[in-house]
Amino acid sequence: MIEKDFVKEGLKRTRIDEYLETKLERAGYGGMDIQVTPVGTMVIVYAEKPGMVIGRGGKTVRAITKTLKNNFDLENPQVEVKEVDVPELNPRIMAHKVVAMLQRGMQFRRVAYSIIRRIMSAGAQGVEVTISGKIRGSRSACAKFNEGYIKKCGEPSIKYVKEGFATVQLKPGVLGIYVRIMPPEVTLPDNIEISEPEIVDVEEPVAQEVPEVQESEIVEEITGEDILEELSEESEIEEITEEIEDVETLEE
């Protein structure tokens, strides 16, 4: 069934992600993306240190490609490595930074505030760091540290907020680190900016003066043909009037 195929592909993607996270922990693994092409399967790996992903002479990336083909049944896998532009805005990288600092014995509050300062200095709108486990005493507890503005629920939280998770084994027990970051380029639906109208100077059209035409300037052209036509019309009228008078005299 189609539903089973979706679940199967999701499990395979999760297994690949966990393998790459374990393999490339020192390289600053920041996530991966899988693209299926007609040629094969493209696996894009995002890392803070791409040189460590490639390895000397491409040794590490060849080993990863071989493992993806044999253990995860990927058809003709091709691994592409991309460097993370701003590691401080990648929650997975920052979660592993918290792990490294806790393993060095630093106090969890100091670690959380240090990471928050780094993330906010990179331009993030908001950040939340959650450390849970045996952080104080023998009982499990949860400590949350946040700064700025970050969405907690709804579609904007799913669509815009980036999340990262990591675990660390310490002497008291296992701690879970959860980092959520609101990137600087996110524009929320309820963020409305009203721009001020532009003031444009419009020049009023200057009315042109129309020269007055005086009666003395209006002159009609009278040609010789017009005079002849008028004379011929007058002679015809006279002839007609004479004929009418003759008829009237005869009737009398």
UniProtKB/Swiss-Prot annotation:
Gene Ontology BP annotations: translation
The UniProt record lists the keyword Ribonucleoprotein: yes
SUPFAM superfamilies, alphabetized: Prokaryotic type KH domain (KH-domain type II), Ribosomal protein S3 C-terminal domain
Domain of life, source organism: Archaea
Region span, Disordered: 233-252
Entry similarity comment: Belongs to the universal ribosomal protein uS3 family.
Function, in words: Binds the lower part of the 30S subunit head.
Subunit structure: Part of the 30S ribosomal subunit.
Name of the featured protein: Small ribosomal subunit protein uS3
Organism (species): Methanosphaera stadtmanae (strain ATCC 43021 / DSM 3091 / JCM 11832 / MCB-3)
Lineage: Archaea, Methanobacteriati, Methanobacteriota, Methanomada group, Methanobacteria
Gene behind the chain: rps3
